[in-house]
């Protein structure tokens, strides 16, 4: 039994971070404090109100603390430690920094593009957007109104006539000189102003251009400006956040149902509602509103883009958060915990979004649980069957063989636990050898205690593949894991699957509408999808390698020049000898050799 008195006696009344550690030497909770002595002492009072906290305290074997210079510094350290240890009793949000942006590149004729990842100098970025769909819808809108190019530079540099986008009035075709650099730059400026929420300024300028064109009796040009203004008015009426006195803000609300939490984030950028995104934290059962909201703010914004205003639906101590966020952003960041008027309406909407998302998630979980129960009953599996792993092999006539392993656990597909395995050193096309290879690599580690042990393993294949799986699990010392081989039925139609068991002579079949079969199909199809996407990527890379890297005289630099100039291997294959010879470092003789090797 842990005795906290010696620890509490020596704790200072200073800001810092504390770590709760269990008997297995695992960090089970990380917290920050303005006053370490008061905060840590609060865990050892009688009659703790939270069952979650009581359970955590009962597992404490020792406590470690780190004193910091300020509460803000403690906040930074706490966030880093939570990311490193992923403690069992901290509310954890998925680390998702891959929000998409709209980019306007720094080219002579800037390109309108979808962007995710590190931002490059010279380009302008607008966002972040909650998802890729919102970005693509916005790009389509910008194409319709401002007609900017979206093609890659390699395509742009090699066009000799306008593409289809010009024909449907979604691009002004700068690639073939149908618009001057000055006029194109003006369109880019208008698009940039629009993305900043300055539609009225854009419409005023377009109105002036329309009037000028009309006075010169250039009525077709005037009609173009008129149509752009009308399109912008339609967008403004649909998307603009009226009476919202800040152009960039995030609105964040939490909802709880049946012990689960959802955080809904509504993004407003440039005065536009870009959409929302819902987050479902781990380890949040028994947590309260303030704990969940604070965990989200710390983990979501500590290393990401932050708008100047955060509107949150929880009463929090915001001073330390505002200090850290402002220092990180290089400008003042405000956190509004008691919004009024229009901001309160938006917070209510975010809360409604969170409730709806949580209800849908719980309903989906219940459906998956009923499917799992039906599968257990139909196949005679124990009630403890929770974690299912499924394997599939993908190749093209033995080329670029890839195996996949997908995981179903806790009532859902666990994509973060999916794995692909490149299969080498076997006879091409030998699926049995490929399955032996992947199962051996996977379960040798599990047997050594380096991975999670599944309750059930699906093998995409019939008796032969199942026999290989039985041999492998016996060899690695895991003979008691339940195995099931899934064979496609006659004509390979869904609903006719047969399931083979090591201990049964005859296969088991389920009716087409059986919920257990639907779960099996979902897991099997996901394994197939994951395997085939990996196979295609590996095959494409291998074919590109064999097509260019095996040609003598073509090193890395020349290969890069060729692929850049023609936009990929297909472009090189479609180029003539004279076109290939125009690439820097490629003589006419070498161009002839490249052409012959590729045809």
Swiss-Prot record:
Transmembrane segments: none annotated. GO terms for cellular component: cytoplasm; excinuclease repair complex. It holds the Pfam family UVR. Gene3D superfamilies: 5' to 3' exonuclease, C-terminal subdomain (1.10.150.20), GIY-YIG endonuclease (3.40.1440.10), UVR domain (4.10.860.10), UvrC, RNAse H endonuclease domain (3.30.420.340). GO terms for molecular function: DNA binding; excinuclease ABC activity. It comes from the Bacteria. Keywords: Cytoplasm, DNA damage, DNA excision, DNA repair, Excision nuclease, SOS response. InterPro entries: GIY-YIG_endonuc, GIY-YIG_endonuc_sf, GIY-YIG_UvrC_Cho, RuvA_2-like, UVR_dom, UVR_dom_sf, UvrABC_protein_C, UvrC. GO terms for biological process: nucleotide-excision repair; SOS response. It is found in: Cytoplasm. PROSITE patterns: GIY_YIG, UVR, UVRC. Residues 200-235 form the UVR domain. Its main location: cytoplasm. Residues 13-91 form the GIY-YIG domain. The UvrABC repair system catalyzes the recognition and processing of DNA lesions. UvrC both incises the 5' and 3' sides of the lesion. The N-terminal half is responsible for the 3' incision and the C-terminal half is responsible for the 5' incision. Interacts with UvrB in an incision complex. Belongs to the UvrC family. This is UvrABC system protein C. The gene is uvrC.
């Amino acid at each position: 039994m842990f005795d906290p008195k010696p620890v509490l006696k020596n704790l200072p009344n200073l800001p810092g971070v504390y770590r709760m550690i269990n008997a297995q030497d695992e960090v089970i909770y990380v917290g920050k404090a303005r006053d370490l002595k008061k905060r840590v002492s609060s865990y050892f009072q009688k009659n703790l109100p939270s069952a979650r906290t009581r359970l955590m305290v009962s597992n404490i074997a020792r406590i470690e603390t780190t004193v910091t210079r300020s509460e803000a510094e403690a906040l930074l350290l706490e966030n880093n430690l939570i990311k490193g240890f992923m403690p069992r009793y901290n509310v954890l949000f998925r680390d998702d920094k891959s929000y998409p942006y709209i980019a306007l590149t720094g080219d002579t004729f800037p390109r309108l593009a979808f962007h995710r990842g590190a931002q490059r100098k010279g380009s302008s970025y607008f966002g972040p957007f909650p998802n890729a769909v919102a970005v693509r819808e916005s790009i389509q809108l910008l194409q319709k109104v401002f007609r900017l190019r979206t093609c890659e530079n390699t395509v742009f540099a090699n066009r000799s006539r306008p593409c289809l986008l010009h024909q449907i009035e979604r691009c002004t075709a700068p690639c073939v000189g149908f618009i001057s650099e000055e006029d194109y730059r003006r369109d880019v400026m208008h698009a940039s102003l629009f993305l900043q929420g300055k539609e009225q300024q854009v419409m005023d300028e377009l109105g002036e251009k329309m009037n000028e064109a009309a006075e010169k009796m250039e009525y077709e040009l005037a009609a173009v400006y008129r149509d752009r203004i009308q399109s912008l008015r339609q967008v403004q009426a649909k998307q603009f956040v009226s009476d919202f006195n800040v152009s960039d803000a995030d609105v964040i609300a939490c909802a709880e149902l049946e012990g689960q939490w959802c955080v809904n984030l509504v993004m407003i950028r440039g005065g536009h509602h870009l959409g929302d995104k819902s987050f479902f934290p781990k380890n949040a059962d028994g947590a309260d509103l303030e704990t969940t909201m604070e965990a989200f703010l710390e983990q979501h914004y500590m290393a990401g883009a932050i708008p100047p205003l955060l509107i949150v639906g929880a009463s929090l101590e915001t001073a330390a958060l505002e200090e850290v966020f402002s220092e990180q952003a290089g400008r003042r960041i405000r956190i509004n915990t008691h919004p009024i008027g229009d901001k309160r309406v938006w917070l209510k909407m975010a809360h409604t979004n969170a409730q709806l998302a949580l209800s849908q998630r719980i309903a989906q979980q219940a459906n998956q649980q009923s499917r799992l129960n039906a599968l257990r009953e139909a196949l005679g599996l124990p009630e403890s069957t929770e974690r299912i792993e499924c394997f599939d092999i993908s190749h093209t006539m033995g080329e670029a063989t890839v195996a996949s392993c997908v995981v179903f656990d806790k009532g859902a597909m666990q994509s973060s636990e999916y794995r692909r395995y490149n299969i080498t050193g076997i006879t091409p096309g030998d699926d049995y050898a490929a399955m032996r290879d992947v199962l051996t690599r996977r379960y040798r580690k599990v047997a050594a205690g380096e991975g999670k042990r599944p309750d059930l393993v699906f093998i995409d294949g019939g008796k032969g593949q199942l026999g290989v799986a039985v041999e492998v699990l016996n060899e690695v010392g895991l003979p008691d894991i339940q195995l099931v081989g899934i064979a496609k039925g006659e004509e390979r139609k869904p609903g006719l699957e047969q399931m083979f068991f090591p201990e049964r002579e005859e296969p088991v079949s389920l009716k087409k509408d059986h919920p257990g079969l639907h779960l099996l199909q979902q897991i099997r199809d996901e394994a197939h999808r994951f395997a085939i996407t990996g196979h295609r990527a590996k095959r494409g890379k291998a074919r590109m390698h064999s097509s260019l890297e095996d040609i003598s005289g073509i090193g890395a630099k020349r290969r890069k020049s060729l692929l850049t100039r023609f936009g990929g291997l297909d472009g090189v294959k479609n180029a003539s000898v004279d076109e290939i010879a125009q690439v820097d470092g490629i003589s006419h003789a070498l161009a002839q050799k490249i052409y012959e090797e590729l045809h």
